[in-house]
Amino acid sequence: MRVLVTGAGGFIGHHLTNFLVGRGCWVRGVDLHQPEYAASAAHEFLQLDLRHWENTLIATRDVDQVYHLAANMGGIGFISSHKAEIVRDSGLINLHTLEAARVNGVQRFLFSSSACVYPSYRQDSPDVTPLKEEDALPADPED
């Protein structure tokens, strides 16, 4: 099985890459940056900006599955002061990667989202119950 992990330089992507390699998958890791704390276990690691269509075509070429974790993100200070930039960049990354996967005949595509899609009233309760996908609706944007 040939697998692409986008966001492979990040915390979750790094651990997912290790897991998939341990399961016998050939893994291509892609990230805007090299992993900061430890070398990637990916068989191939490409440093690509997935906001650009051509790079997503390169990233998704010759793989069977995509685990899509890449996004423009940062700490709360960055997020709070760069909202439009984050929406634009993450939108481009998501749309380009999904379409490139389709064009390149990828069989499976896993999209990883964020707990931030859930309304804050579902996150603030001390009564912690597992959230379901449909709990994100109706949408309740903060700003």
Predicted features and spans:
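N-terminal Rossmann-like NAD(P)+-binding domain of SDR-like oxidoreductases, especially those catalyzing
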Residues: M1-D143
